[in-house]
Every structure is written in structure tokens, then in C-alpha cells.
């Protein structure tokens, strides 16, 4: 049983170690660590544990009052279990059907549970950024920074902050940011409205509402729980719109952002489409210039010399050389109209006003044209809308974008949103492969195709218990809670293995199946309960954890506790009933195969079947 249990647990966790993508890199250590730890525990169980038992365990030693009370409790539970087990085996089909109905009903909780990549953590740190219109001066940005700092100083939950205006990224002096550190949860004041201390998420929601009232600025708050996974901005909602025409992308990105702000699906909506400083464009009329004998080179040199300056010579001073550049005075090149008054020389030597052959326009410049997969793309990002889960925000934002985009343009998740969808696909694949590999290992261990199915019947009910506990505890379905389900798969089937293996041992003595189940299951009830109680006790501190970063531990531990509780209670009844049913199926099939018409007889060659049937007839 120990070897079978260890092999089955390792079979569950090895697929996790070989997952691909971002999640695979993150959980590689997890799968390897669990697998190695379980293998070492098997080595310890077959070597050191027998030695310790021989040295310290004394049979017949008088138990203390606590030990006697525990023994009486387990004896009563075993006696009660024995009384119930008989009717369960008598109504085995009803028991299995009822348990399957419970499992199917519990799957509806998947849609009710909020889904997110990783849970938002109350780390007490977040980033505040503000952007003003391009072209705003440093003085204007500094005034905005002072307003933001004044507000941060007024919040009693804030411990310290640092930051400033200008010089942060490509937006230059028209933006600024601040890194904010909050007081520890224990040190935060009690909110008079709610009568309790506010979490980081609640404080950020209040700040977002208050700072949005400041006119002329686009302010965003972001916590960093997802940035370590995806890098970049680390916004929980990120997607790109892609297409061939940059002007269409720019126009539609504005419409999408406005729609998301209106419907509330995404907060702090922003994009990487940043219009730069306005630029003056000199557009020549080539036909008219050709008629007047003016070359494009002459137009370019005239504008460059007047605005940028032309080198007229060099000045030497003490062995050093300095370029002498000649250009118009500052007051002569302040306005776009000044360019039109410049004179350009024709091939005949005549001077013509530049405005006669060019058109002067002012237009905003682009800081960059971004591409993804060789397509022009604009990234739109933001935080989760208030009262929504990450999955709801992502799905709603993508649906909104796809309604606005014309044919030939598309919206695709990126960053955290892409990692969110890929993570559940990867974990689902690991979940499936773990079951497949565990089945193959158990089939080899028990030399049976049906008994591994009986053992693995504990897994659906562990999932049911985990989903129910996550739902009632107000948790989400995230990477950590799904990883807890995989961990639960490895632990929950240990109980089934103990029941099936011990029943097989008793039947090898010639005991009939029904009597073997009635004898084996009550005897194995104590180690099953001890294993489950130890697992629940070990996970309870993490399930009740508070403080910075406790959210990641809590979702995994709560699912583990709920899954162990439900699977333990249901397994001790479903596994004996399923064992009885599948044993009848196996016996029936063996009898039919002996006659040549079993379930697997079709796999045999026709001649072989005829020979078997002839042999049976002859006998």
C-alpha cells in the first residue's frame, strides 16, 4: 500500500513539473519538490519507521486518559461505520448514483466562483501614476504632483510615499508617479462607516474615486501582485487591438476606452497609444515646384538652414574647433507662418516665397508605432472593474472591443489576461494527465483495469468539497486554488488505496467479498481518519492566515481542507460500494471471456474465438 500510494502521488505531480509556458516555469519547482519529498518519505517509511517502532513502541503499555479517550472515540466510530456499511453495500447502486449526482451538481459552482489569475494581495504597496495632456509643462505637472501628495498625506492608512513629476518613461514632463506604502493591517485605523479596518483593495477603490475628481489628469492605481508573473505594467486586464490601418486603430482604441469607462468593466483604462508633441509638417506641391524650377532638395535645404541652421565655417580657439552655424533669429521662427515667408531660389536664380510651393500643417506626432506578430497593434490595459472578477472584466472588455472593431480588426488578450487564460488551460491539462498517469501506475500496481477506477472515484468528491468550501469562504478560482486541487488529488486517493489494498489482502485468505469489505473497511477507518485529520490540521493555519500575502496561501489551503473533509466522508462509503459493483462486472466478464464472448473477446482473432468456443463445447 505504501509503494502504491507513493507511486500514485508522484504520478499526479510529475505532469505539473513538465507544464509549458509561464505557469510551467513557475510551478516546476513545486512538482519536483513534492515528488522528491514523497519518494524520500517512502524511503523513510520502509527503513527508519520500523526501527523507531521497534525501539519506542511498546505493545500493551497502559494508555493515559487522553489516549484512552481517543481509542474509545475511534472504536465507536468503527462500530457505527460497520452498522452503516451493510446497508450501503446492499443499496450500492443508489449510493453511487447519489454521489455522482452530488458531484455533477457541485460543478455548477465553477460558474459561480469568481475567476482570476492570482488573487489580489494586501501587500501594503501599490503604484500611483498620473498623466496630463502631451505638451503640458513641468510647472503644470508639478502642481498636479503637489495635489496628489497632499491627498496621500491626508490618508491615515498611508505610511510613506515617494515619487515626483516628469522624467518617468516616454511621456516625459507631462506625467509622474508615486510608490505608496501602507501601514500594516493591524496599525490601520478603523473606518467609521464600516466599523472595521480597510483592506488595500478598499483603500485603492476609495482613492480611485477621490482622485478621479481632479480635472485634467488621468490617474491610475495598480497593485503589483501580477507583475512578477508577466512583467511590464502587470495590469490584470490587458489586450491588444490589431489591424492594418493605424488611423483606424487609433480611432477605435479611443472609442473602446470610452466604452469601458462608461460600462465600468475596467477601471483606470489606459493604452500605449501616446501622441507626442505637435510637429510642423512641410508638404511640397511637387507639380508647382517643378513648373517654377524648384527642386525638393532646395526646399529641404532652405527649411533646414533657416530653422535648424547651416554650417558657415569653423572657429579655432586654442587648438579646439567650433562649428559656426547660421539660422534665423528665435523671434523669426516661432510660428508655422514664419516658414511660409522663407525665400527659396529657383534654377534661374529667382527668389520665390516658400509658401507658394508648400503647404504648412500642424499635426500631433507619434512617439512609436507598436507591432505584435508583424501587425500594427495598440495595447489597452486597466484594473478590474469594481465588484467584478478578473475573468468577468477580461471577457467583458474583449466583447466590448470586438463589438466596436470593424471587419479585419481583432482584439486579443496579452500580458496578465493572456497568462490568465493559458494558466487554466495548462493546469487543466496537468489535471487530466495526472489522472491518466495515476491510472496507469495503479493498474500496474494492482494488476487490474477496474480497481484503479474504484480508487480514483475519490477524486471527483474531493473536487466537490474544494469547490463548495471555496464558494462558501468567498474565495476565487485562481492558479493557487487550482494547484490546491491538484495537491488534493494526490492526497485524497490514499484513503481509497488503503481500503482496496486491505480488502484484497483479506480476500486472498479465501474470505468472500462482502465479508472482506465488512472486515477491512472498519479496520482501515482509523488510519484514514488519522491521515485526513492530520492533513486538515496542517492546512488550517494557512487557511486562517492573515497579513501581507496571505491571500495566496488561503485559497489553496481552504480548497484542500474542504476537499479532504468531503472526500473522506464520501469515500468510505462510495469506494466499498464501487468495489462491489466493479468486482461483479469483472467476475461477469471473466465468465463470459471463458466462454469466448466477454467484453474483450472482440479483440481476439476470429479463429481464436472459434477455437475457444470449440474447446468450451468439447468440455
Q: Where in this protein do the model-derived segments appear?
A:
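Hydrophobic transmembrane alpha-helices and their membrane-interface caps
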Residues: 18, 36-40, 44, 437-524, ...
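Residue-level signature of catalytic and energy-coupling elements of molecular machines
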Residues: 2, 15, 30, 41, ...
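N-terminal membrane-entry
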Residues: 32, 421-437, 558
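Hydrophobic alpha-helical segments of integral membrane proteins
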Residues: 23-26, 30, 62, 66-88, ...
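Transmembrane helices with small-residue packing motifs
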Residues: 17-26, 100-137, 185-191, 222, ...
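Transmembrane alpha-helices and their membrane-interface boundaries in multi-pass membrane transporters
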Residues: 1-18, 25-67, 178, 461, ...
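Signature of alpha-helical transmembrane segments and their immediate interfacial
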Residues: 66-118, 145, 210-213, 239, ...
Amino acid at each position: 500500500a505504501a509503494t502504491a500510494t507513493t507511486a500514485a502521488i508522484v504520478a499526479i505531480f510529475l505532469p505539473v513539473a513538465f507544464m509549458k509556458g509561464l505557469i510551467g516555469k513557475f510551478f516546476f519547482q513545486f512538482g519536483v519538490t513534492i515528488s522528491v519529498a514523497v519518494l524520500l518519505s517512502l524511503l523513510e517509511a520502509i527503513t527508519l519507521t520500523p526501527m523507531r517502532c521497534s525501539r519506542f513502541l511498546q505493545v500493551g503499555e497502559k494508555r493515559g486518559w487522553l489516549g484512552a479517550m481517543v481509542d474509545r472515540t475511534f472504536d465507536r466510530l468503527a462500530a457505527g461505520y460497520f452498522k452503516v456499511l451493510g446497508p450501503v453495500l446492499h443499496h450500492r447502486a443508489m449510493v453511487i448514483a447519489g454521489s455522482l449526482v452530488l458531484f455533477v451538481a457541485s460543478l455548477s459552482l465553477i460558474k459561480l466562483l469568481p475567476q482570476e489569475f492570482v488573487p489580489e494581495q494586501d501587500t501594503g504597496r501599490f503604484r500611483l501614476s498620473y498623466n496630463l495632456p502631451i505638451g503640458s509643462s513641468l510647472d503644470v505637472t508639478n502642481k498636479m504632483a503637489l495635489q496628489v501628495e497632499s491627498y496621500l498625506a491626508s490618508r491615515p492608512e498611508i505610511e510613506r510615499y515617494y515619487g515626483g513629476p516628469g522624467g518617468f518613461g516616454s511621456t516625459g514632463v507631462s506625467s509622474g508617479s508615486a510608490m505608496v506604502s501602507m501601514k500594516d493591517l493591524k496599525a490601520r485605523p478603523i473606518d467609521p462607516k464600516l466599523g472595521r479596518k480597510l483592506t488595500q483593495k478598499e483603500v485603492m477603490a476609495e482613492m480611485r474615486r477621490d482622485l478621479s475628481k481632479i480635472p485634467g489628469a488621468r490617474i491610475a492605481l495598480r497593485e503589483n501582485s501580477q507583475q512578477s508573473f508577466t512583467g511590464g505594467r502587470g495590469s490584470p486586464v490587458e489586450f491588444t487591438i490589431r489591424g492594418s490601418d493605424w488611423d483606424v486603430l487609433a480611432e477605435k482604441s479611443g472609442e473602446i476606452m470610452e466604452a469601458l469607462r462608461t460600462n465600468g468593466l475596467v477601471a483606470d483604462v489606459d493604452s500605449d497609444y501616446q501622441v507626442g508633441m505637435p510637429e510642423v509638417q512641410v508638404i511640397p506641391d511637387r507639380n508647382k515646384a517643378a513648373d517654377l524650377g524648384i527642386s525638393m532638395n532646395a526646399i529641404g535645404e532652405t527649411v533646414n538652414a533657416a530653422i535648424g541652421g547651416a554650417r558657415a565655417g569653423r572657429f579655432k580657439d586654442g587648438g579646439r574647433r567650433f562649428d559656426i552655424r547660421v539660422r534665423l533669429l528665435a523671434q523669426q521662427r516661432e510660428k508655422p507662418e514664419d516658414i511660409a515667408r522663407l525665400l527659396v531660389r529657383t534654377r534661374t536664380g529667382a527668389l520665390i516665397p516658400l509658401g507658394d510651393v508648400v503647404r504648412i500643417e500642424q499635426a500631433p506626432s507619434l512617439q512609436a508605432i507598436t507591432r505584435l506578430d508583424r501587425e500594427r497593434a495598440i495595447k489597452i490595459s486597466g484594473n478590474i472593474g469594481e465588484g467584478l472578477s478578473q475573468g468577468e472584466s477580461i471577457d467583458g472588455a474583449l466583447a466590448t472591443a470586438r463589438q466596436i472593431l470593424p471587419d479585419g480588426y481583432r482584439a486579443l488578450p496579452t500580458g496578465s489576461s493572456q497568462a490568465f487564460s493559458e494558466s487554466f488551460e495548462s493546469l487543466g491539462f496537468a489535471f487530466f494527465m495526472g489522472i491518466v498517469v495515476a491510472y496507469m501506475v495503479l493498474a500496474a500496481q494492482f494488476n487490474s483495469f477496474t480497481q484503479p477506477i474504484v480508487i480514483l472515484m475519490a477524486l471527483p468528491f474531493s473536487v466537490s468539497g474544494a469547490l463548495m468550501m471555496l464558494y462558501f469562504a468567498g474565495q476565487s478560482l485562481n492558479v493557487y486554488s487550482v494547484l490546491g486541487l491538484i495537491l488534493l488529488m494526490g492526497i485524497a486517493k490514499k484513503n481509497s488505496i488503503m481500503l482496496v489494498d486491505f480488502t484484497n489482502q483479506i480476500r486472498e485468505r479465501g474470505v468472500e467479498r462482502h465479508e472482506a469489505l465488512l472486515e477491512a473497511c472498519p479496520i482501515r477507518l482509523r488510519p484514514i481518519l488519522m491521515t485526513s485529520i492530520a492533513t486538515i490540521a496542517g492546512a488550517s493555519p494557512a487557511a486562517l492566515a492573515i497579513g501581507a500575502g496571505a491571500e495566496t496561501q488561503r485559497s489553496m489551503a481552504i480548497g484542500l481542507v474542504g476537499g479532504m473533509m468531503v472526500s473522506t466522508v464520501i469515500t468510505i462509503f462510495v469506494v466499498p460500494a464501487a468495489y462491489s459493483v466493479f468486482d461483479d462486472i469483472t467476475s461477469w466478464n471473466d465468465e463470459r471471456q471463458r466462454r469466448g464472448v466477454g467484453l474483450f473477446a472482440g479483440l481476439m482473432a476470429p479463429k481464436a474465438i472459434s477455437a475457444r468456443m470449440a474447446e468450451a463445447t468439447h468440455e
